[in-house]
Amino acid sequence: MASMASLIHRNLQRKQKPFFLFLFQTRLFTDSATPSQSIEKILVANRGEIACRIMRTAKRLGIQTVAVYSDADRDALHVKSADEAILIGPPPARLSYLKASSIVEAAIRTGAQAIHPGYGFLSESADFAQICEDKGLKFIGPPASAIRDMGDKSASKRIMGAAGVPLVPGYHGSEQDIDLMKSEADKIGYPILIKPTHGGGGKGMRIVHSPNEFVESFLGAQREAAASFGINTILLEKYITQPRHIEVQIFGDKQGNVLHLYERDCSVQRRHQKIIEEAPAPNVSSDFRSHLGQAAVSAAKAVGYHSAGTVEFIVDTISGQFYFMEMNTRLQVEHPVTEMIVGQDLVEWQIRVANGEPLPISQSQVPLSGHAFEARIYAENVSKGFLPATGVLHHYRPVSLSSTVRVETGVEQGDTVSMHYDPMIAKLVVWGENRVAALVKLKDCLSKFQVAGLPTNINFLQKLANHWAFENGNVETHFIEHFKDDLFVAPSNQLSSNDAARLSATVVAACVISREHSLLKENPPGNSSLSIWYSSPPFRVHHCAKRTMELEWENEYDSSASNLLTLSITHKPEGTCLIETGQEIFPAVEVKATHLGNNDFRVEADGVSMDVSLAIYVKDQTKHIHIWHGSHNHQFRQKIGHELSDDDEAQHKPSFDTASHPRGTVVAPMAGLVVKVLVKDGSKVEEGQPILVLEAMKMEHVVKAPCAGGVHGLLVTAGQQVSDGSVLFSVKDVTSTVNSMLENLRLLMFSDENHGLMPYVAVNVKQPYLRIK
């Protein structure tokens, strides 16, 4: 076995080619498991992409799988992917995916010998791992004792401190009295980081810059931690202002062997959640990598660890010192980038280690080949502070898979991204022979990844991948904040951006017309003898057929401005369309579009040929058209008319639009649950004062007063569901209230009993006696 691993290692160093597919088909483990220990059926206690990913490996190993699902996930992809599926409760996670008794009961009912927890939910619950063991079920993960020691971030820091691993200054005690915590925060010194002692994913984390913010931040972190992990204990740490987030993948077996599989850089984050990860970490020396790996292995051995785990470190970019942050006692979301560079299936390792088999290779035999990136594709409103989004995936076409491109997903076209769970749509994972090659592939795949129906972060990921600092590997956890002017502000060449949108609009028009003609040829209306009028180009006597099409460009940089494009289209005899925008600075373009089927087209414009894809659907009584061509993608809206004909969306979803509401009106920025109302209707508030707290996808969002004044129409209560765009309350300032009263008085003075205006007599209506500005 060792010779086989060495041979693979030598070949990798020589050829530098992706090899994980070969290794996934090669048995490297020994047959130490007895027949009574063998796992033949696994219940996956999770949902979404990780459940699908676990099932894929299990099926390759010939192991049957059982899915669990809530009412909201009845038709989910992970349910369809399993051999069996069991309903475990209503949509809220605390009543389904976090309900250990229901999951264990489902495993016993279906005859599963083991439970794989995935990540999140119960994956880091020592109690759940212990229940599995007590019921005779294999928990595919570390022992309950290790989860308890390392899953509790306070306890893990005490263990690491005793082992001599550097720690960030902070408070890791069990006493949670708010006055004590506030005192400890003062001792540490601001800014401080508040975070839950259990769980991960950035949930419950708060950066606090001053004592005035502490109480509300602390209570909010407790609520979010309780909702996400069922435990609300908190720890405090000094906030390092320029850190890198580097983590080490470790793996242990039940024979006491532990090794590391190198590090991942996860520094690029928003809302304390990673969005682009890579392995190995850029700009890291071999000595630093070795010291980091050794520290991670020592941490795992200190608690008798086996299975997959991740030791996370904060690296101070100023001093170069690394500090232990926490240990995640589970498989990480970003584990695929490690699999890509070491050529191992970590889920297979988990299953075999749970079966009692030793690790297949030693530390010296762990290969390191090439570079890998993972980009997390989320349903979220980037321009609204990355707030999670909900809606229907009207169009979903990931990139093509290959030996160097993976897509981990738990959704398919037509699915709904709900408010109950994490808004991740997919993980795009790419491999290259080096970082430059891998980054080129990442950019290309992002430009071809098609999602329509709800807002996503794909364009933002493209900006990140193309940023000069990211290209150079100069990353740290404040990357997005530091380069916000580059990432969020419109391109300096606004004219070029408008030109690209107009080109896309002309291509859309040509493709829509080509699609119409294809449909009319297949199903001519009325008497077939009239089909000449529906030919391509349409037949006309003594002139060319013309039409007008209006498209409204959805500009991600300026959603408030009107970007209405009026296109004049002339059908030419040779089958092309002459498309004019009505502006002299944009000349007419002659375009020919050939419908290839579905929503794919081949377009020729000004001597240039391009492949084009469209997505067309109806939402909010408006046609939405998305176009992808080359590295460009744009979105347009169109009033419903005869030009297009698609089925309407099944459910109406209010848009986030406050333009039609009076000044001071506050609408829900996302669909969610009201978890706390902080003031009463009629209360006087200051600008920026928190009014209520919304929770969606296990993340809290504080809704604040837009101005000083009185709160009116605050009718929502804690526990109430609200839809995206629904009115929550309004704040009326004194000025607007007085002006409104004067206006009403003026109308009353000049109206008769029949509410008709009386003749203008003594008072100048246009000049009231008093007007407060």
Where are these regions (language model features)?
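A generic structural motif
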Residues: Y69, I240, N328-L331, N381, ...
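Catalytic cores of soluble metabolic enzymes centered on carboxylation/carboxyl-transfer
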Residues: A296, P336-P587, P690, Q720-K773
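N-terminal non-catalytic structural scaffold regions of very large proteins
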Residues: E312, L564-I569, P573, A593-N598, ...
